[in-house]
Amino acid sequence: MECGQSFVIAKMNTRNVDFVSIFYPQRKSNLRGDTMKKLSFLSALCGAAMGFGAVASANAATTLEAVKAKGFVQCGVSQGLPGFSNADDSGKWTGLDVDLCRAVAAAVFGDAEKVKYSPLSAKQRFTALSSGEIDILSRNTTWTMTRDTQLGLNFAGVNYYDGQGMMVPTALGVKSATELDGANICTNTGTTTELNITDYFRTNGMSFNLVAFEKADEVVAAYDAGRCDVYTTDRSGLAAQRGKLTQPDSHVVLPEIISKEPLGPVVRQGDDQWFNIVRWSLNAMINAEELGISSSNVNMKKFQSNLAPSVARLIGKEGKFGEELGLSNDWAYNIIMQVGNYGESYEKHVGLNTPLKLARGVNSLWSKGGILYAAPIR
């Protein structure tokens, strides 16, 4: 109940309230003095409470201020998904999602290495973000209406367009997902995958038995041990986890794509500045690829005099777009120089020359037949 509501209810529940004097103060009131004192006290109490709340709100540090104070960005990532967020034996994190965290650090600090990583299960990720344990969630997370409107979170964009698929052992002899009636299916808890697979089997009049685990490695181990006939997750995830199987070549991804999975970074609601920083860090990487600006030529462009206006704005030679974010005007230059453009990140971590061998497909630029499109910096 709101403070103002309490005050109104208190007035309505107080005996001998003179409604004539309330609505017509120029007329003489017969309201007893002690009742008026009670109402005055309640009014003062509410005012003090509201004032205290306003002061507390005004003194609360923004995410950017908190990040600068501690000296790094705390980024929530997966517990190990090659190509997207995965740590090597030395503890170094790499991947498409990791590069987004590094881009934010480059924008804020001018140093892409000022990031610390929190490996999170699908079940843990939203709680970790809501509680303030992490500053940004960049963990192959699907943007859905419920997540966007009911959890107090904001999706800052899409850094990978995906769809859910299914992998089966070649020995099963299955060519299509429509042949999987009665199958045992392995997947992760706390994901859209569970809902999508239920919808697909129900729509196609088939039954199945779901075997769900919290950790991705548990799912892979169960499937590899033969506890399930099918492993289902995003198709990029299947490509990433396939390499962990005892005999990767003895498994095939079926042709059906049963859902839309727009994956992207997530932040808490209520801090538009931080939301903008994360969103425009991603936009800068996409715009850089479209404009032909990469980590190998951005430094040369910085000292070039006859730049196209769109390039000059992107790398901070024209306008004050960094200041609008609360950053230095070379924020995007730092991202491109230290992390690269979107295409560089894609090809380095998940492209055709990596173990995942993922073609760009819909993740190509809009000008090259894909749907990747960033708002302009101007």
Q: Where in this protein do the model-derived segments appear?
A:
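Short, Lys/Arg-enriched N-terminal segments with co-localized hydrophobic residues
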Residues: 9-35
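Sec/Tat signal peptide C-region and signal peptidase I cleavage site
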Residues: 34-35, 54-60
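Bacterial N-terminal signal peptides
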Residues: 43-53
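Extracytoplasmic small-molecule ligand-binding "clamshell" domains
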Residues: 60-138, 321, 327, 342, ...
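Bilobed "Venus flytrap"/periplasmic-binding protein-like clamshell domains
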Residues: 74-83, 93-108, 142, 162-214, ...
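Extended ligand-binding regions for polar small-molecule ligands
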Residues: 99-102, 106-108, 171-174, 178, ...
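Acidic, polar ligand-binding/catalytic clefts
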Residues: 102, 106, 110, 114-179, ...
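Short helix-initiation/N-cap motifs at beta->coil->alpha
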Residues: 115-127, 210-225
